[in-house]
Regions:
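Extended catalytic cores of very large enzyme megasubunits
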Residues: 1-826
Length: 826
């Protein structure tokens, strides 16, 4: 029992129980009916020593409030914690101005000077409302303090409050804006961040204003089948890992047993190169552990049966590599073969280069025609495997390891505005953008474009064009890249009048490209009007535009391609909370119709914002390498089977959107929408993860060395309306993702869930059926496969705290998120 109280200034005073009760009452003001704050105060007092420090008493109140496992407990703990943070930052009760805070950080060399006048700082100060911090959940503030606020990690001094940190991001993003309207844009940007309508990625919070301009944390790249290209891919892996990126790679090297130099050397296959890349990635620390890599391979690869078990703990240790993740790429032809219980033959880029390229094309019919041509060719050596067994084993690997993923590569290349082939995805399989391998590591340092096409026309021999140059083909709306020129087509350079007919294509080279993703997300629950959503979509893309232009590119050629391509990925956050507020289930027709409306609104406003930014700042240099200039919207290529799920209706004029895209010639960005996991944002913004239903109403989340109790927003009043993931079937999940995929030009970090009862097993027929159903509904990806044995009914009603961390016998953390940089966790 406390007798004496030691205040923060060291003064010792007699303990006053009424003040302690008053403190607890203030902590619960506004939601006292949902929490027994008196019990928490009494409990805390009983746990303290006779001489108690103020900080220890506050910590006790916070701990006991959190142990209630309720939303009200989170709010009470957050309110008390906010006072601690403010006193820590301000050094007392008196608040410092933003200018004072920035001066302190600049003197400590943790922040650069921003180009704002004293008058502008004074105006900005009026927009900051520190009282918002006192209405945050505890985990929001803890995540902000521990991960996002600028600090000295040696002395452990924290320099910023939550509102200061958000304003720093907004000020950096708007610093280069037109001076006439800059303050208006800044106010809008800060409002969206502060009111939790817009979620920025971790690199923006950590790096903006520090002079460390690293804003991309995920990248995709391809490795070609030469020693020089392999060396270049190693450099990419190394550089992007120490730049804190999570990686996705398609290594298009030969398979085990393939000939080298006419057969004088036998190729060792992909597995040794996977091991080499693993060593490169893991030798560079990102936070508390090594980097992260997802290797993509074809389901038709001659080594497929060995590649798919690399992560399985039952694989012999000399044949496994559990330190990275793997994604197998399938298409509808392979799945049809699996459904018919037929065999497929295996091939790769070395044995059948044209067939391999067709796998990444837009026409499945063209792939099938070529596949059957090779099958009929007796001179083409073929090894057959059971398509059914291949798919069943792939799905089984997902259940056994949790982190064996699938990508429907034909759907990826069909339902997209990109005209260049998409060869893989990223670490979290939500980014689907074109890549192409480098022929030599020196090309990474080129400050000029490297692609070209040489051809003859009726008028001229040996014409040479940059492969990226826009040309107009007779009969086609808008320009395309010169790399698309074929024999017999009539073309003209953009801006000229005379057409020329191509008589022969002599040589082509695609532009080598590493794809970088710049992310943001919109928290749908907090965008209450169409005007708010439109402005938030604009601010999300405005922020990404800043990142693309101001990022530090460690490899110069990446700057050329990233700024020419201008890829954005804006996702949806807090869908589960939104659905609970609407009292709608993910699995009902009404629920799917609401999800359809949410996805449509998201796509509409982002496309509109891209057009607007294109008008203001110019279209992406490579916009002609997409179909946006031809009026493409997701409605042009989505899988129409999704429309059988519910009587969906449209809320926007999509014909007018297409006309506006044509009139503008596209927009500011080549890619727009991707739905990332959002693991970090769910803590910082008090939102639910991405599109996912809840795993639990309360959960202990770990992040490196930090752990915190997370409770679903408004769980005290909405818990009966939250959909629990474990109570959904995998078909339900496919329906959810299919509805959102309809409106998404890229992909989704699409988790599946399975609760096993006792010795329950999933039949191979069920796995084949549901994998084919994924393809039938237009789903592009399968990310984590979450499974556990539990009482399914209990999960729907009991607030169960679940620890996310699992460590396997190799010492690998299997809990996720894999990417320690949180690049995909906006």
């Amino acid at each position: 029992m406390i007798k004496e109280f030691i205040k923060r200034d060291g003064t010792i005073v007699p303990f006053d129980a009424s003040k302690a009760l008053g403190w607890g009452k203030w902590g619960a003001k506004g939601f006292a009916k949902f929490i027994d704050w008196q019990k928490i105060v009494v409990q805390t007092v009983s746990q303290m020593p006779e001489r108690c420090k103020a900080k220890d008493f506050n910590d006790g109140l916070i701990r006991n409030a959190l142990n209630e496992d309720t939303w009200a407990g989170q709010l009470m703990a957050g309110r008390i914690y906010a006072t601690d943070i403010h006193k820590e930052v301000f050094g007392g009760k008196k608040r410092r101005s933003l200018r004072e805070v920035h001066d302190i950080m600049q003197a400590a060399n943790v922040m650069v000077v921003l180009n704002y006048s004293d008058t502008e700082y004074a105006q900005i100060e009026e927009w900051i409302d520190h009282e918002r911090d006192f209405h945050c959940a505890h985990y929001q503030l803890k995540q902000g303090r521990d991960k996002y606020a600028l600090r000295n990690r040696i002395s452990k001094r924290v320099y910023e409050t939550r509102q200061h940190a958000l304003m720093r991001v907004a000020m950096v993003v708007c610093e280069q804006h037109d001076p006439i309207t800059r303050m208006a844009r800044l106010e809008s940007m800060f409002s969206d961040l502060s009111h939790e309508r817009l979620s920025a990625p971790t690199p923006n919070h950590n790096n903006m204003g520090t002079g460390h301009n690293g804003f991309f944390s995920c990248c995709l790249f391809t490795c070609g089948d030469t020693k020089e290209s392999i060396t270049a891919s190693t450099v990419i892996a190394e550089v992007m890992t120490y730049m804190s990126a999570g990686l996705g790679e398609n290594m298009q090297v030969r398979s085990l047993g393939d000939p080298i130099r006419g057969g004088s050397i036998i190729h060792s296959g992909k597995i040794p190169y996977y091991g080499k890349q693993t060593g490169v990635v893991k030798s560079n620390k990102q936070g508390s552990r090594g980097g992260s890599l997802n290797e993509f391979f074809s389901g038709f690869d001659p080594e497929v049966t060995e590649l798919m078990v690399l992560k399985n703990p039952r694989t012999p240790i000399n044949k496994r590599n559990r330190s990275i993740d793997y994604t197998m790429m399938l298409n509808n032809w392979l799945l049809a073969k699996s459904s018919a219980d037929e065999e497929i033959y295996l091939f790769n880029a070395f044995s059948a280069p044209d067939l391999y390229a067709a796998m990444y094309g837009k026409s499945l019919d063209a792939f099938v025609e070529l596949y059957e041509k090779y099958e009929a060719d007796e001179s083409f050596e073929k090894t057959y495997v059971s398509a059914r067994k291949l798919v069943v084993n792939a799905r089984s690997e997902g259940f056994e390891t949790g982190r064996f993923y699938l990508l429907l590569i034909d759907e990826v290349n069909y339902h997209t505005p990109h005209r260049d082939p998409i060869l893989s995805s990223n670490l979290c399989v939500e980014i689907t953008q074109p890549t192409h391998y480098y022929d030599h590591l020196t090309e990474l340092y080129s400050e000029k474009f490297l692609g070209f096409i040489t051809f003859d026309t009726e008028e001229k021999q040996g014409m040479l064009l940059d492969s990226n140059e826009p040309v107009e083909i007779k009969g086609m709306v808008g320009a395309v890249a010169a790399i698309e020129l074929k024999e017999g087509v009539e073309f003209r350079k953009k801006g000229t009048f005379t057409y020329s007919r191509v008589t022969r294509v002599i040589e082509t080279r695609r532009e080598p490209e590493v794809s970088l993703c710049a992310l943001a997300a919109i928290i749908v629950t907090n965008c209450e009007t169409e005007e708010q959503y439109a402005e938030c979509a604009y601010n999300a893309l405005y922020m990404i535009d800043y990142c693309i232009d101001n990022n530090h590119y460690a490899l110069p050629h990446m700057k050329l391609t990233a700024q020419a391509r201008r890829n954005a990925g804006v996702g949806i956050m807090d869908l589960a909370h939104h659905m609970a507020r609407k009292k709608l289930s993910y699995t009902s027709q009404e629920g799917l119709m609401e999800i359809h409306r949410v996805g449509e609104r998201h796509a509409y406003h982002l496309i509109r914002a891209s057009i607007r930014l294109g008008q203001e700042r110019g279209n992406a240099e490579w916009i002609h390498k997409t179909d946006w200039p031809r009026g493409w919207t997701p409605l042009h290529t989505y899988n129409q089977n999704v429309d059988t799920l519910a009587p969906f209706v449209y809320h926007y004029d999509w014909n007018q959107v297409s006309l506006d895209l044509i009139a503008q010639g596209g927009g500011r960005f080549s890619s727009l929408i991707a739905h990332m996991p959002g693991e970090s944002s769910s803590k910082y913004s008090a939102a639910t993860n991405s599109l996912m239903p809840l795993r639990y109403l309360s959960i202990l989340k770990t992040d490196g060395d930090n752990s915190m109790i997370w409770v679903a927003p408004e769980a005290d009043t909405l818990k009966e309306w939250y959909t629990i993931a474990w109570n959904m079937t995998r078909k339900d999940f496919t329906n959810l993702y299919a509805v959102i995929q309809k409106w998404t030009d890229m992909s989704i970090s699409a988790d599946d869930y399975q609760t096993f009862k006792g010795d329950e097993k999933i039949s191979s027929s069920a796995l084949i059926e549901e994998t084919n159903y994924m393809a039938f509904m237009g789903r592009k990806s399968l990310y984590y496969t979450n499974s556990e044995t539990s009482d399914k009914e209990a999960l729907a009603t009991v607030m169960t705290r679940k620890v996310r961390r699992d460590v396997d016998e190799d010492g690998l953390d299997l809990s996720g998120p894999v990417c320690t940089s949180d690049g995909c966790s906006v």
